[in-house]
UniProtKB/Swiss-Prot annotation:
Disulfide bonds: none annotated. InterPro entries: Globin-like_sf, PBS_linker_dom, PBS_linker_sf, Phycobilisome_asu/bsu, Phycobilisome_asu/bsu_sf. Its EC number is 4.-.-.-. It comes from the Bacteria. PANTHER family: PHYCOBILIPROTEIN APCE, PHYCOBILISOME 32.1 KDA LINKER POLYPEPTIDE, PHYCOCYANIN-ASSOCIATED, ROD 2-RELATED. The lineage of its organism: Bacteria, Bacillati, Cyanobacteriota, Cyanophyceae, Synechococcales. This protein is postulated to act both as terminal energy acceptor (by its phycobilin-like domains) and as a linker polypeptide (by its repeats and arms) that stabilizes the phycobilisome core architecture. Has intrinsic bilin lyase activity. It is found in: Cellular thylakoid membrane. This is Phycobiliprotein ApcE. Belongs to the phycobilisome linker protein family.
Length: 896
């Protein structure tokens, strides 16, 4: 798969923390029910305490500096810690109506509560803030440094601020998500014990402001206790995505992301559950498999399966299998779709995710094509992944954002698959996207094909994703430039000939309307835009052309800009200024900016005002930035005041269509009545067959050259090689021949009888009695003392590896990587392990099997292996110790 592949850019908003209302509503929404009594009581208690929680947060916010200062004075010595606290920049609107008196009043309020002043300081000395860690030592400010002081004060202010967030949210989840795991981070820069003491001091200081309100004090202490416990807790391990396949990305999800996401309740059918709990589990299975509670929505159920799973006759895994094989599932999610789309939906319902890779789609597509829906369901339910995630009792659930790490290569398609509208999309998404990874970039807008309007005169008509989904993610990067077709002479395109931007297209392009009387292609000066040499009729023709270019049609009388038309006719404004006023009009804003997404609006405006589609991301991002910071009118000015507009149209020319996309040209050319005679006609070129060209000799060759060429390549020795294959041990002659061939292959000579009798008699008898096969006989020869004495002891490891591949694989080593692999085995485990790795390897089994004696194989791939094998076989075994496959070729031969 290409590393530049794109899985789409579907918008996903991960949940950063949980609140009481969101958690309660999310659980009810997942279970497709109304809020229960306990949840309503929880919400009632939360909203009743809302005023108190806001009061607590406001008090802590107003006295944040004093609280942080008290904590800093507790752990720092030798200076004023509060001077290092950098306050966040406040926006100006937030200061409207505020004054210095109100800020002074907040300080007075803090002191009146007994937390400030002399007595407050004495009280903080004698009050107990909690157990002090034994390793705590005050930190000297001078040695700690200004930079570290700023970071420490910032962190203490951060702890207090997030505590107020959690108090207002009514859920400590925001503290859990953002605090757990900070212990290891702060430990590298500061003392953990000092941080704990500072949090305890802030806890005591915050509680002092609510001594007269027991309920508020209890809330403050509760959330600070959670802050302390979460800070002391070790960093949780990441959630690793499970999967047995080699083509699935091994991804990890930080535990903080998992804690922040909406909790997805998991249901499991256990024997001890009550009847109501079992009904809830069955409904969860219906919601997962059929994407809705069919009992509630359609008054349908599969009663005999429900009774079996309730009574424990079948497991939840078997219940899911039978639901997916039911006629109801087949009718809704299999028959209306082609196999690839039905496969995607089955992944969503049974495994809770979309297909992960192209290989996975191909594997299960083959299953569903050959065995239908039952085979697909069995393959998914019986998979190792299903067993790891759900087992026998758990109902499958959606493993989406926040539940586990998501893959980038199927990001957009998987987010669409999790939506409720997924069954209404008939076009398969995963296989089409995976197939485009290794193809050229498509002819479409860089931010999706849905941003390309139909290239017609009337209005901005964009394809709708709800009717005919056509969006395809494509890996357009910032350096990609879209190919456009110039409407005019090809030599005048602005990419290859930038100086010809102002040249008019003539008869090959659109009709050009100008206000002055110059000839087409004449150089336009700065003051030629106000010429009124034409009469009223020609000026009105230019105005109509301007309306059609900007708006795509003629306007009604009440919609026309009469004042701007009069100024243009009188020469008060130029055509360029007139176009700018049209584009800034309220009608244009309502028609082509407000109803559309910013990307579509910019694309349409660019085609109308500059006469061409946008090139790529750099151009689009530039207009995006202007639109977000300055708005619609700044985008219009950026286009009309650009250098390209000045070069192409100047001050007196109405913009016209200069470039088309290939898709737009094809759409226009395919219309009835627009086909030319030279389109659609097949022209066959007479081409000489390639085999005829290759058979022709271009040069005159002499007899010595012909003889040399005929001797190139593999010799006839390969055709004359005799292969010894032991089919039956009853044929003693064949057994004897195979044994002799094995001696010649391994030892490169026939062995004397006395050597055979002393060392190999046992091996020969075992082979003759069919106790071992030829492969084991070869391995026994390689691990014998004779082989070790002849080919292992006298040579270095690299030479041993060369001779080993020659004797047991019939070739020279492939490359240095193979030599390194065998060298590691030989050095760490010895000769027997080296011989075993070759003889028991897949290459040996595929080439020789268990009953064939190894032989010279004449390998041709890789290219360097053939001459290396040739040299290895043509030289005598003990001729020299020079390597055939060296790691490098020396520049100067030493000792020559």
């Amino acid at each position: 798969m290409s590393v530049k592949a794109s899985g789409g850019s579907s918008l996903a908003r991960p949940q950063l923390y949980q609140t009481v209302p969101v958690s309660a509503i999310s659980q009810a929404e997942q279970q497709d029910r109304f809020l229960e009594g306990s949840e309503l009581n929880e919400l009632t208690a939360y909203f009743q305490s809302g005023a108190l929680r806001l009061e607590i947060a406001e008090t802590l916010t107003q006295n944040a500096d004093l609280i942080v200062s008290r904590a800093a004075n507790r752990i720092f010595t030798g200076g004023s810690p509060l001077s290092y606290l950098e306050k966040p920049v406040e926006r100006q609107p937030a200061l409207v109506g505020a004054s210095s008196d109100s800020r002074n009043g907040s300080v007075t309020y803090a002191e009146s509560n007994g937390s400030g002043g002399l007595f407050g300081g004495l009280r903080s000395v004698f009050s107990s803030t909690g157990p002090i860690p034994p390793g705590f030592r005050p930190i000297n400010i001078a040695r700690y440094g200004p930079s570290n002081m700023q970071k420490s004060l910032r962190d203490m202010s951060w702890f207090l601020r997030y505590t107020t967030y959690a108090i207002v949210a009514g859920d400590p989840n925001i503290i859990v998500v953002n605090t757990r795991g900070l212990k290891e981070v702060i430990e590298n820069a500061c003392s953990i014990d000092a941080t704990i003491v500072a949090i305890q001091e802030m806890r005591a200081a915050s509680a002092d402001y609510f001594r007269n309100n027991a309920q508020a004090k209890e809330i403050v202490l509760q959330y600070f206790d959670i802050l302390l416990s979460e800070f002391k807790a070790p960093t949780p391990a990441n959630k690793v995505r499970q999967g047995p396949s080699n083509d699935i990305q091994g991804l990890e999800l930080p535990q903080s992301y998992f804690n922040a996401a909406a909790k997805r309740q998991k249901y499991a059918m256990k024997p001890g559950l009550s009847a109501l709990e079992k009904n809830a589990v069955i409904k969860a299975a219906y919601r997962q498999i059929f994407e809705r509670d069919i009992t509630k929505a359609y008054s349908q159920s599969i009663s005999y399966l429900e009774s079996q799973v309730r009574n424990g006759d079948i497991s939840m895994k078997e219940f899911v299998r039978r639901l997916a094989k039911s006629p109801l599932y087949r009718k809704q999610f299999f028959e209306p779709f082609i196999n690839s789309r039905a496969l995607e939906l089955a992944f969503r319902h049974i495994l809770g995710r979309g297909p992960s890779s192209r290989e996975e789609v191909q594997k299960y597509f083959s299953i569903v094509s050959s065995g239908g829906l039952p085979a697909l369901v069995d393959a998914l339910v019986d998979s190792q992944e299903y067993a790891d995630y759900f087992g026998e009792e758990t109902v499958p659930y959606l493993r989406g954002l926040g539940v586990e790490a998501q893959e980038c290569r199927n990001w957009g398609m998987q987010q669409d698959l999790f939506s409720y509208s997924a069954p209404f999309r008939k076009v398969p998404q995963f296989i089409t996207t995976f197939a485009q990874y290794d193809r050229p970039l498509p002819d479409q807008h860089v931010y999706g094909s849905g941003n390309d309007p139909l290239e017609i005169q009337f209005g901005a008509i964009f394809p709708k994703e709800t009717r005919n989904p056509s969006k395809r993610p494509a890996p357009f990067n910032k350096d990609t430039k879209r190919i456009l077709i110039h409407r005019g002479p090809a030599v005048n395109n602005q990419v290859g000939n930038p100086s010809a931007v102002g040249e008019f297209p003539g008869s090959l392009g659109a009709k050009v309307f100008r206000l002055n009387g110059g000839l087409p292609g004449a150089k336009v000066g700065k003051n030629t835009g106000t010429s009124v040499k034409f009469g009223e009729s020609s000026t009105q023709a230019l105005i109509r052309a301007a309306y059609r270019q900007v708006f795509g049609r003629d306007l009604y009388e009440g919609q026309r800009l009469s004042v701007a038309e009069i100024q243009l006719e009188n020469g008060d404004i130029s055509v360029r200024e007139f176009i700018k006023r049209l584009a800034k009009s309220e009608l244009f804003l309502k028609l082509y900016w407000a109803p559309h997404y910013v990307c579509k609006a910019i694309e349409y405006m660019h085609r109308r005002l500059l006469g061409r589609p946008t090139y790529g991301r750099q151009e689009m991002n530039q207009y995006f930035d202007i639109a977000s910071k300055q708005g619609f009118y700044a985008v219009v000015e950026a286009m009309i005041d650009s250098k390209e507009y000045s070069d192409a149209f100047g001050e007196d020319t109405v913009p016209y269509e200069r470039y088309l996309t290939p898709g737009g040209l094809q759409m226009r050319s395919a219309r009835v009545g627009s086909l030319r005679e030279d389109i659609g006609q097949r022209v066959d070129k007479e081409v000489t067959p390639r085999f005829v060209e290759l058979g022709q000799v271009s040069a005159i060759r002499t007899e010595p050259e012909i003889a040399y060429r005929s001797n190139q390549g593999v010799t006839r020795q390969r055709q004359q090689t005799k292969v010894f294959k032991l089919v039956s041990t009853y044929d003693k002659v064949a057994v004897k021949n195979a044994i002799r061939a094995a001696y010649r292959q391994v030892f490169e000579r026939d062995l004397e009888p006395y050597i055979i009798n002393s060392e190999f008699t046992a091996l020969e008898s075992k082979l003759s009695n069919n106790e071992i096969n030829v492969k084991e006989f070869i391995e026994g020869l390689g691990t014998s003392e004779l082989y070790m004495k002849e080919f292992y002891a006298p040579y270095p490891n690299t030479k041993v590896i060369e001779m080993g591949t020659k004797h047991f694989l019939g070739r020279a080593p492939l490359n240095q990587k193979e030599i390194q692999q065998y060298n590691q085995i030989l050095a760490s485990q010895g000769l027997k392990a080296f011989i075993g790795a070759m003889v028991n390897g897949m290459e040996y089994l595929q080439t020789f099997g268990e009953d064939t004696v190894p032989y010279r194989r004449f390998p041709t791939l890789p290219a360097a292996n053939f001459p290396n094998t040739e040299r290895l076989y043509n030289k005598l075994t003990k001729q020299d110790k020079e390597l055939v496959v060296p790691s490098f070729t020396p520049v100067v031969k030493v000792g020559g």
